Design a protein with these regions (language model features):
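Condensing-enzyme catalytic core mediating Claisen C-C bond formation in acyl metabolism
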Residues: 1-23, 166, 197-258, 262, ...
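Buried hydrophobic positions in well-ordered alpha/beta secondary-structure cores of metabolic enzymes
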Residues: 7, 33, 42-45, 86, ...
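Short glycine/threonine-rich loop-to-helix capping motif typified by GTGT followed
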Residues: 53-60, 241-244, 277-299, 327-329, ...
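Conserved catalytic cysteine-centered active-site region
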Residues: 2, 52-104, 112-117, 121-145, ...
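Conserved active-site "lid/cap" helical segment
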Residues: 1-84, 153-160, 182-188, 201, ...
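Extended C-terminal subregions enriched in glycine
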Residues: 249, 253, 258-280, 289, ...
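Active-site-proximal alpha-helical scaffold in enzymes
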Residues: 80-111, 143-177, 217-222, 324-346
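Beta-strand segments within the central parallel beta-sheet cores of soluble alpha/beta enzyme folds
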Residues: 41-50, 75-81, 105-109, 163-169, ...
C-alpha cells in the first residue's frame, strides 16, 4: 500500500474565542496547514467534529472548507466519533491516501463550546453515551464514570488523590511553555487537591475543560520528513458494565496493539506520547493499556516523574487535554500538531532526540480509540 506522510500542520490557540465563529477557527487552522505544506492541490477534505450541529447549528463542515478555501469540486465529509472525532478523521484521510484514491488530503478538526452554558454542553456531550443504557438512565456522566474508575483504582493499588494531582500538575506545567494552550497560569499540588470537587475523587483540575479551537493536518503520498508509520482504530464497550473488568479500557489497549503490530514496533520504541487525558485518571489507565508501564503501576511512574518531559516516557508535553484544552473535534489533531513539532525539534518542552511518537485519542468511555505512530525520517 501507498505510504502516508505529513506535509503541514496548523492550530489555533485553544481557549475562549467568544469573538470568533466556529467557521473562522476551522478555516484559520486549515489555512495554516495548507501554507505549511506549500499550498498543494487537495484531493479530499475530512473534518472531525462532534457538537457543531447541537451547539452552533452548523453542519456541512467539509463543504465549507472546500468552498471557502477554493479547493474545487472535491470529496468532503464530516467525521463523528465523540471525542475521537479528530483521530478518526485523520485515519479516514490516511486510508484514502494509502488506497491510492487520493494523493493529498486536508484533515481538520474544530469545536466551539465556550459560548454555551455548562448544563447545555454537558447534555450535548452525553450523546457520546449509549442513551438506552442502564448507566445513562441511572444518571451516570463522564466525570462520574472516571470517578468510579479512580475509586476502584485506589482500592486495587496504593494510589491516592495526590497521584491524580501529580498528573494534573505535570500537564499544567507543560502547558505553561505552550503558547497555544488554554491554561498558562502556574498552580501547585495544594491548589489542585483543594480545588472544587466535581465528582469524588475528581476535582476541577482533574477534568478537561470546555474549549474553543481548531487544528488541521495535510497528509500526502509524496514523501516528507514525517512518516505516518501506523494508524489503528478500534471500537469498544459503550458502557462500563460491558467491559470485562472495571480497571480496563479495552479499546485503548487493542488500538495500541494493532498500531504496534502495523509499525513493527513496541512501547519501548516510542520517544514521546500524547495521551487522551480527558481526566487525570484516564492518563494513568492509558499509559498502562498502551504498555508503557505495567498494569496497576502507572501511578508509580507518575510519582517517579517518568512521564515528565525529561522522564523515561514523556507524556502530554503539550499540556494534554487537561491544560492544552479539549475542543472535542480538534483534540486528536492537536495531538498530532504537537508530535510533529516534537519530531521536528521545534516543540514546547522538546524531548531531546525524539524520533518516534505516538498519539492516542479516545471517544466516549471507551467506545472508540484511535492510535497513530509517527516517525521522523
Amino acid at each position: 500500500m501507498t505510504k502516508t506522510y505529513i506535509h503541514g500542520v496548523g492550530m489555533t490557540k485553544f481557549g475562549n474565542h467568544s469573538d470568533r465563529t466556529l467557521k473562522s477557527l476551522l478555516l484559520d487552522a486549515s489555512r495554516q496547514a495548507l501554507e505549511a505544506a506549500g499550498r498543494p492541490k487537495i484531493d479530499a477534505v475530512f473534518v472531525g467534529n462532534f457538537l457543531a450541529g447541537s451547539m452552533s447549528n452548523q453542519e456541512i463542515l467539509g463543504a465549507i472548507v472546500a468552498n471557502d478555501l477554493g479547493l474545487g469540486y472535491i470529496p468532503t465529509a464530516k467525521v463523528e466519533g465523540a471525542c475521537a472525532s479528530g483521530g478518526i478523521a485523520l485515519r479516514q484521510g490516511i486510508l484514502g491516501v494509502m488506497s491510492g484514491e487520493y494523493d493529498t488530503v486536508l484533515v481538520a478538526g474544530v469545536e466551539k463550546m465556550k459560548h454555551a452554558n455548562t448544563p447545555d454542553v454537558t447534555q450535548a456531550i452525553n450523546a457520546a453515551m449509549d442513551t438506552d443504557s442502564n448507566e445513562k438512565h441511572a444518571g451516570l456522566t463522564f466525570p462520574g464514570f472516571f470517578g468510579v474508575l479512580a475509586h476502584r483504582y485506589f482500592h486495587e493499588t496504593g494510589a491516592t488523590k495526590e497521584h491524580l494531582a501529580m498528573v494534573a500538575l505535570k500537564n499544567r506545567e507543560n502547558a505553561l511553555n505552550n503558547p497555544l494552550a488554554q491554561f498558562q497560569k502556574a498552580t501547585s499540588i495544594e491548589e489542585i487537591m483543594n480545588a472544587r470537587l466535581i465528582t469524588e475523587p475528581l476535582g476541577l483540575f482533574d477534568c478537561s475543560p470546555m474549549t474553543d479551537g481548531a487544528a488541521a493536518i495535510v497528509i500526502s503520498r509524496k514523501p516528507s520528513s514525517i512518516h505516518v508509520r501506523a494508524s489503528a482504530l478500534v471500537s469498544g464497550p459503550t458502557q462500563m458494565q460491558d467491559a470485562a473488568e472495571l480497571l480496563s479500557i479495552p479499546a485503548i489497549g487493542e488500538s495500541g496493539r494493532r498500531a504496534y503490530e502495523k509499525a513493527g514496533l513496541g512501547p519501548e520504541d516510542i520517544d514521546v506520547i500524547e495521551i487522551h487525558d480527558c481526566f487525570s485518571m484516564t492518563e494513568i489507565i492509558a499509559i498502562e493499556e498502551l504498555g508503557f508501564f505495567k498494569r496497576l503501576e502507572g501511578w508509580k511512574a507518575v510519582e517517579a516523574g517518568h512521564t515528565k518531559p525529561g522522564g523515561k516516557k514523556p507524556v502530554n508535553t503539550s499540556g494534554g487535554l487537561l491544560s492544552r484544552g479539549h475542543p472535542i473535534g480538534a483534540t486528536g489533531l492537536s495531538q498530532i500538531y504537537q508530535l510533529v513539532h516534537q519530531l521536528n525539534g521545534t516543540a514546547p518542552n522538546q524531548v531531546k532526540g525524539a524520533r518516534i511518537a505516538l498519539a492516542q485519542n479516545l471517544g466516549g468511555t471507551g467506545s472508540y480509540s484511535a492510535v497513530h505512530i509517527l516517525e521522523r525520517l
